């Protein structure tokens, strides 16, 4: 039996590959012997990807062009691109959710059985059960512009555009798992707490130092995650080692959620 953690012979696609978690993931996939890595980003990645697609994932046309440009089939899609709420609301929701969903829809038919889709979500999206019924209605709206109109009609939800975008990603992971699973494709998401990347400054600007520092203190490490630590979980979820995982949102929070659920927060 081969190494279930290996990516030998696998073709993978990574969005948001130029920096932070995406860049760390590309480096890790090279170490794990990935056969072909397609990097999608608006900026040129420094890492050793085999194909680079410059893309604006905030627009439907940009996402469609990126999907069309992917060289050949892919066994694993890492939908990792994301922006903070320092960007306009529609940009946040488009990049963090609509682009992710559309790439999944376009690339999944080109995957073979045993393929995997891994979303980078966030612990900021764990409030989705409070909006479950509304978000399930959104999942049924496939048209990009109609989905944006739905967001416009729900200002009570879009007030926290980043949190909502990550709630959408987590619900989509659940929603799509049934249909994808029947085609032999798994979908999971990883939900990190704050990560020590250049984007952290944007989160501090929108979520406040007080909230982020509190979240970090609830974990046993007492510090933000590193990009490498998050990339390692993503790589696991996309590998054969996670072959029995489908439709799950995995916390990467050093125990913060456990503390919340058991009333042990500081």
Enumerate the predicted regions with their spans.
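Catalytic loop of short-chain dehydrogenase/reductase
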Residues: 84-85, 90, 116-182, 194-195
């Amino acid at each position: 039996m081969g190494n279930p953690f290996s990516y030998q012979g696998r073709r993978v696609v990574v969005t948001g590959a130029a920096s932070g978690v995406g860049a760390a993931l590309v480096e890790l996939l090279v170490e794990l012997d990935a056969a072909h890595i397609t990097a999608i980003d608006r900026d040129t990645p420094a890492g050793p990807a085999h194909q680079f697609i410059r893309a604006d994932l905030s627009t439907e046309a940009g996402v469609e062009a990126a999907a069309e440009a992917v060289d050949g089939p892919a066994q694993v899609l890492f939908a990792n691109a994301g922006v903070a709420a320092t960007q306009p609301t529609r940009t946040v929701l488009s990049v963090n959710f609509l682009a992710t969903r559309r790439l999944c829809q376009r690339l999944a038919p080109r995957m073979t059985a045993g393929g995997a889709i891994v979303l980078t979500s966030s612990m900021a999206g764990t409030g989705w059960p409070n909006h479950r019924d509304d978000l399930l209605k959104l999942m049924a709206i496939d048209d990009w512009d109609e989905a944006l109109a739905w967001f416009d009609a729900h200002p009570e939800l879009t007030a926290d555009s980043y949190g909502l975008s990550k709630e959408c990603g987590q619900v989509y992971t659940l929603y799509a798992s049934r249909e994808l699973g029947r085609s032999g494709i798994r979908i999971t998401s990883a939900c990190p707490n704050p990560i020590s990347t250049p984007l952290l400054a944007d989160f501090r600007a929108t979520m406040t130092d007080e909230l982020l520092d509190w979240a970090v203190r609830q974990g046993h490490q007492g510090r933000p995650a590193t990009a490498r630590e998050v990339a390692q979980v993503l790589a696991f979820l996309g590998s054969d080692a996670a072959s029995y995982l489908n439709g799950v949102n995995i916390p990467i929070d050093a125990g913060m959620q456990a503390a919340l659920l058991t009333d042990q927060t500081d």
